[in-house]
Every structure is written in C-alpha cells, then in structure tokens.
Amino acid sequence: MGVPKKYALVSGTGEADTSLAAFDAALIDAGIGDCNLVELSSILPPNAEEDDLPEFPPGSIVPAVVAKAVGRGLVSSCICVGRLESGLGIVSERAATDSVETVRRLAKRDVEEMARLRGEKLVEVRTVTASTEPEDAEWAAAVAAVVFWG
C-alpha cells in the first residue's frame, strides 16, 4: 500500500439490541458500513487533501483511524487531526462513556502533546465527533473516523 493522497473525516451513531449491531449501525450512518476497515495509527501524510467520502464498492479494504464507543448509556467519540508546520498531520482518536465535550478536549490535548513531542507547532486543528445514547434499543454506538484512499 502506498501513501494515501486523500482523506475524509466521518462520524455516525447507531443503536440496536446488541453491541455489535449498534456498532454496525454507527458505521452505516458514517458511510463506511460496507467496508473492511484496516486500523491505522496516527499519521496523516503531508500532501494528503481532505475530500468528500467516495462510494467504496462493498467489501473494499479501506484504511482508517477509528474511534468507537459502545455502551448502554451515553457514548461519545472524537477524531482530532492536527496539521504541523512541516505539513505532517497527526491524528488522535478518543472514545468514552462520557460527554462529547470531554472526548473532544482529550483528543485535542493528545494532538498538542504529539506536536510537542515532535518539536513542532500546530497550524490547524480539526475535529469530528459523534455522541448518542440508546432511546429505542439496549445499546448505542458512536463512531468517528478519518478514512484514507487514493
């Protein structure tokens, strides 16, 4: 696999009577429910451009950094992308049975610390979040992701 040229920030929520089905519903809501996601760590290529999520053929192998929270109460997730002066991007994923404000704050703090460890300054910070709690089912899920392709 080469260096991805494009990425999209996506999020979704779902609920169901099982934890797995709630997670599946959240992936569907985020537009990536029919993909085989390959988990990545926390680096956004320097020249990657943000774009709208394409329609991947069902079963596509798609690289992504994913934050997922699944539970029987409030669940929240956040992806935070920080762009450094060098152009490199760093990604933090946070998920918890807590408020969206809490996971966003923690994800931003992660990115600030990751920049500090590299001796660089952040020039841009973007977040995508999801938060929900079950209303009509036993389980809820919140997913936030940065998806790569190209």
From Swiss-Prot:
UniProt signal peptide: none
Keywords: Decarboxylase, Lyase, Pyruvate
Cysteines engaged in disulfide bonds, as pairs: none
Catalytic reaction list: L-arginine + H(+) = agmatine + CO2
Protein's name in the database: Pyruvoyl-dependent arginine decarboxylase
EC number, UniProt record: 4.1.1.19
InterPro entries: Pyr-dep_his/arg-deCO2ase (IPR016104), Pyr-dep_his/arg-deCO2ase_sand (IPR016105), Pyruvoyl-dep_arg_deCO2ase (IPR002724)
Family according to the record: Belongs to the PdaD family.
